[in-house]
Amino acid sequence: MYFIGLDIGTTGCKAAVFDETGACFGRCYEEFDIICRAPGWAEQSPAVMWDAVTHVLKESVAQAKAAGMRAEEVRALSTSVLGEEVMPVDGDYRPLRDAILGMDYRADEETKLLTGAVPAQRIYDITGFPPHPMGSLPTILWMRRHEPELIPRTYKYVTFTEYVMKRLGAREGVVDHPQAGRTMAFDIERKCWSDELLRAAGLDRSLFCETAEPGRVVGNLSQEAAAELGLTEAVALVAGGQDQTCAALGAGLIDESIGMDSHGTIEGIGVMSSKKITDERALAAGVSCYAYTIPGRYFLMSSSQVGGLLLKWFKNNFSLAEEQEARRTGRNVYDVMTERAPEGPSGVMVLPHFIGSGPPWNDLDSRGAIVGLTIDSTRHDVVKAIMDSLTYEFKINMLYYEDMGFRFKDIRVVGGASKSPRWMQLKADILNRPVSTLREKDAACLGAAMIAMCSMGAYPSCEQAVRACVKVDRVYRPDPAWTGAYEAAYRKYTHLYDSLKEFNHIKIPGGTV
């Protein structure tokens, strides 16, 4: 039996074909660009995304066939999809505009209108979503206020989950509970859309799709999709999860002693929880709480607004020499950049708030900064400062989770950074905790595929699927030679935001400095 995990992210999508042991027989990735039509805006073309989806599915299936798989052996496909994105579609599921992404903050005023109608703590108690412009609900209100001509043509507001599943052959658009939990409109205890919040927003429940537990079969591949992908119509389409929850399952988070460092375009900490946590302290810290890929469990997450995106920004603007060397030698440009970074704490520090700050400050007006530069500083020092500072941000949130009672025996890293031994050792030294990487680097694809496995009866539970399929590749342990120096640097870093806050909030023509 074979199972397909499809992972749609912020800047690209990938697909992977696994057997029931978690062995991968084909994979493909395709990148796409974020559309930025104005400062602070971020959109994605559903047409570009769909073309990428069909390409990665076809290519991964072709690779698996070349390795001996037969089309009729593929049992099911499930999805892992970025959260918060939303777009209106008509009755034929044709998009009426590009999707607005979660990193788009244009709906700040609409968020304030919602919290004026329903107190922030009440919204958080219902949805587990700290009120924020990234939520789908305030974004929908922005569309209705600024693009009213679309209202009469709108059949549903959907994420990429419903859109892709419908185009693949699902009977109707269905959104899984973890993904619905990223809309700021879903009641995470009752597992349905919140009538209270929809009334406050002036929206009818009929504008939203049906919701489903991860693992529910929502249809089968259509004849057209099966022919295009080289599969059969017998392939079941299985409700999956939001990308962070699928990555967490693929990283083996089946108890509360394992934390996840999801380090891709953005970086965040995630942990499985046996109980809902939406108290005042968690709200103040910006902790998201929503449905996990294991029914009856919750997923807690705190995300920075950047991660690998910040290193990409530096590469695009300052690393021409490293790009040329990477092309000449056939190496990854980020490996070239990070290997030249000096050892030990950088004398330079970066405040990585280039798109505002995430938890625990949750300050949209905070801005990025590079401090501590001298005439002797080089771009390699700044690269190291980016690596250090992103890890300091993660540590602040990790320690908050430990204050809540979580005791991490292991931090498992997923995403692009997990492929860098240099960065993994740095994380272990700064966090002063064991840090692990996984045999299967595409954890979100594996997580989605394991949901499909359980749905088809390959395993009686996700926990058993994890024990069979998830394997730790390498454990990085803190180096005592560096932990003390990094702890001292971390303590200095914790003062950086407050030191720059007043300056960052000065309004000048053209925006916020």
Put a short name on every predicted segment:
Residues 87, 109-113, 247-249:
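Pocket-flanking alpha-helical
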